[in-house]
Structure formats: C-alpha cells, structure tokens
Amino acid sequence: MRSALSLKPSNGNAAKSQAVNNKNVIKNAPLGGKLTRQIGTSNLLQQALPSKKIDESPIIKIDAKDSFKVFEDQEPEKENSSENVDATEKDSNVIPAEDNNMIHELERKMEEKSRAEKLKFKFMQTRDNSDITSRFSEPPSEFSVLCDDDDCDKVSVASSTFTTSVRATFSSFHFDENQRKKEFGKEEAVKKIQKKAAKEARDDSMFSSEEFFPDIIKYMLHRQTKNRASHECFDIQSQVNEEMRTILIDWFSDVVKEYNFQKETFHLAVSLVDRALSMFNIDKMRFQLVGTTSMMIAVKYEEIFPPEIEDFALITDNTYRVPDILLMERFLLGKFDFVVAMPTSSWFGTCFAKRMNFTKKMRNTVHYLLELSLIDVHFLRYRPSDIAAAACCFANLQADVESWPQKMVDDTGISTEDFVDVLRDLHRMYLNASTADFKSIFYNYSETAQMEVALLPAPTDKLRSMFPSIFVTAPKSSNDSSSPQ
C-alpha cells in the first residue's frame, strides 16, 4: 500500500494545479496488474521561499487519499515470459514484465544449470544389471549382463548385490600393456601389408598397361641421363676412396635388412651418396654422416612408415647427433637443388621383370645382381636401364628362358648389344661375391627368405655360347655351372 506525498509550495495556485495533475495520473493508471509510481514534484528549488507570516498555512501539507487500490503481480510463466508484455509498453511510466520476472528467470536458469550438472555426472551412478567393464577381459561379477549397447547410456538404480560405482570399478581395472603392444604391432603389420599390396597393384597396372607404358618408359629413359653421378667421382676426393664407399654400401645393406626397407630405398640412398661424391670434396670424418643423411632422405621419399630421426642417430652408435643429421640434410638438399627422385636400376629391373612375368625366384636373382652392382663404382659408367636389362637377361638364362625377348626390344628399344659389357661385369661380380671382403649382400641373398638365389650356379656356358668373344676367358668358381659338381 502506498500513500501519495505531495509538496505544497507557498504559491497556492501552483499547488492546486499539481494536485489536479496527480489525480489525473492516478485515474489514468492501467489496471493490468502493474504498479505505477506516483512522482511528486516541487518548485521549492525554483522559487525562493517567502518570509514566514503568521496568518499563512504551513508550507508542506500531507494529503491522504480517500481511497487506494492494491495491485498484485501475476504468476510468471516458466517458458515464454517475454510474451507477457503489456500492450501499453510504449508508455514510459509502465515497467515491462521482463523486469518484474527477473528473479523467476534467474531461478529457471539455475534449475537448468543444475540439471546439466546432474547429466554431466550421470556415468557415476550405479547400475543394477550391467556394467561398462563387462565388455573387457575382467573376471565375471555378481550381476548378470542382460543389457544391450543402447542401455549403457541409461541410468539405473543400484541393486543389493552390486553397489560399487562405475568409477570405483574403473579404478581397479587395468590393461595388459604387453597385450596392447602386441595388438598395436599387429595393426601396424596389417597396414604395411595392405599398403604394400596396394603399391604392387598400382605398379602392375602401370607396367602392364599397353596404353601408358610406352610414354612411361620413354620418359624414364630420358630422366636417367639427367643428374647422373660420375664414375670418376673419386678424382676430386682427397680423403675418401673406393674402399670406404664399399664399406658404406655394405653397411647400408645391413641397415636396409634390419629396418626392412624397400629395395628402391637402398638404391636411391647409394645414388645420393654418389651424387654427393661427384659434387664436392668430402672429409673422411663426415663421410658416414653423408651416408646416414642420404639414407634418411631416401627413406622419407620411398617408405610408407619411415622411422624416427633418432633412429638414424642410433644406427651410427650416436657418433652423430640429430642436429648434425638435420644440418647435413639441409646442406645436401641445397646441393641437389631438391631433386631427389632419380630412375635407378632397381626401378627398371622391377619394370622389366613385371613385363616379362618373372617368378619370385627370378625377381630375387635380378635384385641380387642389381645390389651387387652398387658395390663396384665402375658400374656408374653404365646407364641404370642397361644394368637392369643385363640382370634380367642373366636371370632368364639361369631359368632356361629366352634371354631377351624381341618384345622387350620393341617395348624398350634396348638390345643385347647395348648391355653385353654390363652382363660381363655382372657375371664377374656374381662369381666373386662369395669370396669378396664384404659379403653382407651375399649373406642376405643366401638365406631361405630370399630363396638362396646367391647360391645358384651362374649360366656361364650359355653366356659363352651367346657371346663367345666376350666370355672366352670367363673365370670359374664354385657358383659356375660349368665347374664339376
């Protein structure tokens, strides 16, 4: 309840007119349940108070209303409170419903926040017939598992036999770390097999395509003549010699076998080392660093799952640190002008073997000969395509197949006269591999996994019959087919 206070100024006429205005405001007040504030005004500050006289009435007069009304607020709606706005909202003296329901709006928001907090910790409540951990390899509990996967998101009341919370159950749950590693290793192995199978399928489709193969082989034969290493690269070297290069490549073979790298990675790494030897003088204390960095670059380019850079520092027995390898990588890539991919004899060998439908044993023989050619620096004088063609011819003769079919001559433009000298040097390397000083490649291809192709006899008699002027004085060894068995 409110009573109106009105200020009566010394000027009776002004007070009278003000009282009339106040009554009009009260009469015109809306009856929609809204309280209006009656504002009294005074002109005491506007006019100076006259001197007090005995006969005049007091300055301030308290008038009490004869009647008054009490208005109550309506019940606020929970949802659409903003719709409960009076039609006379334009009137500046009327307070909107939003302001009157502010407390209710805050209470509603607090309730919503409380419900959200309860849903957030919903998983902490117990269940009566199911538990999340029942899906794992934990011993069976006292409760029965009768729920579906959809029921796992529902909250149930705890039963008398199972009152432990899910959080407490998870606290006692543990994974088998070794089992997890085994499963992860199996997944990685499956991924590698799938990636390798996909790559082989792409290679088969590329090499067997009669539409695209002529353009592909023409382009690769042209590319092999660009950025080639020189067989005279050691003429500019003052501290590194051919024996050190042979030791490095023999070590490469062990690294490739240890990490199960692709054969193309091995050939590309050797190609990068030879290009570095042809470009600048290398200090012997940094030669292994150049080789390690070249292997890392080749691995990044060829492998699907390359090892970490720390592994390359580890294979050097921490002789070189990671910053040293990264610095050398920047240096080599700058020297190569970032041209890394080059056609190698491994690429041509794979291409020719697929075109001639080689067996696995014949393919292993081809790759064995190609890796032997990496050891001798004098093979740098031959083109990679000629080395690959000679290796395929050698494998055909060893398997009693036509040495170099006319179809390959038509497809590649390479004839036997182009690689007869290469074939002679490959035959020599094949015979001397078992007695060489560095036998890593020989031992690798003498294993059962490689079908022991390094132990097969060389087709010396067939080579002599085909090229009598070249293989007249061919040496004999335990691998020679013409030697007594």
Swiss-Prot record:
Description of the deletion phenotype: Homozygous mutants are not viable. Partial loss-of-function mutation bc416 causes cell division defects with a reduction in the number of dividing NSM neuroblasts and some embryonic lethality.
Tissue: Expressed in the cell lineages ABarp, C and E as well as the NSM neuroblasts.
A single Gene Ontology CC term: nucleus
Bias (Polar residues): 8-24
Residue segments, region Disordered: 1-24
Pfam families according to UniProt: Cyclin_C (PF02984), Cyclin_N (PF00134)
Keyword Cell division: yes
Protein name: G2/mitotic-specific cyclin-A1
Naturally occurring in which organism (per UniProt): Caenorhabditis elegans
Lineage: Eukaryota, Metazoa, Ecdysozoa, Nematoda, Chromadorea
